[in-house]
Amino acid sequence: HIVNGSFHIADAVLLFLLLRLIFRKHLPAFLAALVFLAHPLQTEAVTMVTGLGDSLSVFFVLLGLYLYFRLPERPGLPLYAYILALMSKESAIVMPALLFLTDLFYDFGNHKNSYDSRNHRSRVLPLLPFIGIALVYILLRATILNFSNSFNFYNGEGLFASSVLIRLFTFFRVLTVYFGLLILPVQLHMERSVEIALNFLSPSVIFGGLAFLSLVGLAIFSLRFLRWRTFGFGILWFFIALSPTSNILVP
């Protein structure tokens, strides 16, 4: 409990430092870190021994992001943090995408707060070592580290494993559950199961699908209007971070 709790507190501190660096304001960063620290949904990561992997991976991802933008003259440090994040939990593989997203929305290259002030090539080139590490990790998981069918957790050809559409509908249903727990965190327990969605004609699937399309639309809208960029940044961060466990492409 001490170890898990300590890393959770450290994650909140790093989140505050990163958001303060991004927004250049103390209050929004503090409030976001406070919600992260105290939200009941974090209970599993703090109280369960097996939840340490989540806290560790978040710690190294946030550390890598902070070092990448705070100390650009030390490019090796965030790379080490990325490797440690991957060794903690493989969902950290999305860190290069989070780096690109942050630089795109807040333009740490020249601090002009403009999406068009630098071309995307200059943003992508520093990320090539991170992408290389991610590709090597995927190769290892597909070969010598393929302990238990890495890219298909279902041994049979069930509906969920064989149909991308059903996985997408189920993802919409899961989004409904996620948003509900974020707003009203009740009946929290381990190993929450969600019924597979066989079609779109279900209230939870429809709500999740509409929420997804609306949020993605708002994120795209924010690209054209800087005053909305914080909303777009948060929405895209949420879906990028969720993508490794969404089961849409890989069941």
What is each PLM-predicted segment?
Residues H1-P251:
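Polytopic membrane enzymes that build or remodel cell-surface glycoconjugates and lipids
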